[in-house]
C-alpha cells in the first residue's frame, strides 16, 4: 500500500504542475496580449500572425530539444500531422472571425458550448460514456461561467457559421491531441515538436491575409516599437509554456477535463482584470465565478468517483478470477484425495 502511495504521489504532483503551468501561462499570455493588442497599449491587431510567431518559437524550442537529445523523436505519419495542423489552424482562424462577427456574449456562449460538443464527439469517436455526476458538474460549470461572462447576445448568419466551424474544429483538435498521443505512444512535447513547424509555416503565410480581412490593416505597414517587440517576445515565450501544458493536460486527462478545469482561467482573468486593469466586478460576476468553482469541485469529485469505481470493478474481477482458480484447485485436490481414499479402502477390503 505504501509503495502504491509513493508511485501515485509523483504522478499527482506532475498532474498539478501541468495544470498550474497551463493556468499561469494562459492567464499571462492573455494579459500580455491585452496590452499588446488594445488601443490603449500597442494596438498590434494581428492576432493570427502573432499565433504564427507563437508556434515558430515553439517549433524552435522543439528542434533544440531534439538536437540536444532532451526529447526523442517518434514516427508519426505526415498526413496525420498535416490533418491535425489544418484542423488546428481552422480553429484559430474561425475563433478570430467569430469574435469579429459576433457579439462578445454570443462568442462566450460558443466557447462554453465546446464542453458538450467535446462530450458528444468523444462518445461518437471513442464510445466514451459519462456518469450522471460528471454531466451535472459540466452543466454547473457552463452555467456559472455563462453567468459571469455572457452579456449581450446578438446573432447573425455569417457569425453563426463561423462560430459553428470554430466549435467543431476546436473540439476536434483537442480530441486529436489525446488520440494521437495514445495511437503512436508519443509524448506531449514530442507531438507538439512535430506539429508546431507545420502550424507556424502555414499561419505565417496565411496569417497576414486573415488579419487584413479582420482588421483592414497590413502587418508590413505597422510601426514596430521596441516596447511592442518586447511584448511580442513575452507573448511568444508564454505561448511555448501554454502549448506544452495544453498537450500535457489533454494527454494526461481528457479533452473534457481540459475544458472544464480550463474555465478556472476565465475566473482568474476576470479577477486579474479587476485588480490590474480596473475592470468592473459586479455581483453577477462574483456569483457566476462561485457557481463555476463549485461546478469544478463537483467535477473533480465526480471524476475521482469514476476512477474509484473503475478500480473497484477491476479489483472485483480480479478477486472473482482468483477465487475461481482457487476453487478449481481445491476441487482438484478434493477429487485426488477422494480417489486415493477409494484406493486405500479397496486395498483394505482385499
UniProtKB/Swiss-Prot annotation:
It is a multi-pass membrane protein. This is UDP-rhamnose/UDP-galactose transporter 3. Nucleotide-sugar transporter that transports UDP-rhamnose or UDP-galactose and UMP in a strict counter-exchange mode. It holds the Pfam family TPT. One of its GO terms (molecular function) is antiporter activity. The chain crosses the membrane at residues 12-32, 41-61, 81-101, 104-124, 133-153, 160-180, 200-220, 224-244, 257-277, 286-306. It is found in: Golgi apparatus membrane. Coiled coil: none annotated.
